[in-house]
């Protein structure tokens, strides 16, 4: 998964200049303090997904603002967010992180919107299975169609991690209005080929190759 996300982050850098990085789907940085790789996926609706990799394992935290699991919906229906409603919201947030090993939970720093969470999953380094938060559905879920399963946005947000170049291209053709010439270049990046000027030109002729290489090297993507 980490390799896939790095490839997507490189493709987003190619498609969008650094000044407009807010438009990118996947952003990446390395947290020196916690020694972990930090990826953030930002949907066009403002929902987000953090994927954190460390030597202790992987932590994924997502937020779908329309989900009935959104902590902020607990305040709806009240004239103001009184002390009781705030206490209930904080308790609900804590329950989302219940069971996560301390070494993984410590990776979630202040700037990662800790209170904005509708699902959480993690995997210890010595395991192959994923653990998920076991949170009872709040009363806000009762207002939804009983035939619709609310997973906190997990399926929708995790779908932004594209396993193949074909799937990335299908998304990028709409989001970035990517030309057909870009498909082969995207496939070569997915195949871990060295990034060339021709590949950049095929994907986005408006971007400067050297500035892309510089940003990728500084961030640790190359």
PLM features per residue range, with description:
Residues 63-71:
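Short, solvent-exposed aromatic-acidic interface loops
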């Amino acid at each position: 998964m980490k390799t896939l996300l790095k490839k997507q982050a490189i493709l987003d850098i190619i498609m969008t200049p650094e000044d407009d990085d807010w438009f990118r789907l996947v952003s990446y940085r390395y947290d020196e303090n916690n020694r972990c790789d930090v990826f953030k996926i930002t949907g066009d609706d403002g929902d987000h997904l953090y994927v954190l990799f460390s030597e202790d394992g992987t932590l994924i935290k997502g937020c779908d603002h329309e989900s009935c699991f959104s902590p902020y919906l607990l305040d709806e229906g009240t004239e103001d967010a009184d002390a009781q409603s705030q206490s209930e919201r904080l308790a609900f947030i804590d329950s989302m992180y219940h069971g996560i090993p301390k070494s993984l939970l410590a990776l979630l720093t202040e700037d990662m919107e800790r209170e904005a969470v509708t699902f959480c999953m993690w995997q210890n380094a010595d395991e192959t299975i994923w653990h998920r938060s076991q949170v009872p559905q709040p009363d806000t879920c009762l207002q939804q169609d009983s035939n619709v399963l609310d997973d906190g946005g997990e399926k929708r947000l995790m779908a932004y991690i594209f396993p193949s170049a074909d799937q990335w291209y299908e998304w990028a053709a709409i989001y970035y209005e990517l030309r057909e010439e870009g498909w082969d270049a995207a496939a070569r990046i997915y195949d871990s080929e060295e990034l060339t000027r021709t590949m950049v030109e095929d994907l986005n002729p408006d971007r400067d190759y050297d500035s892309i290489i510089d940003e990728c090297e500084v961030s640790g993507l190359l």
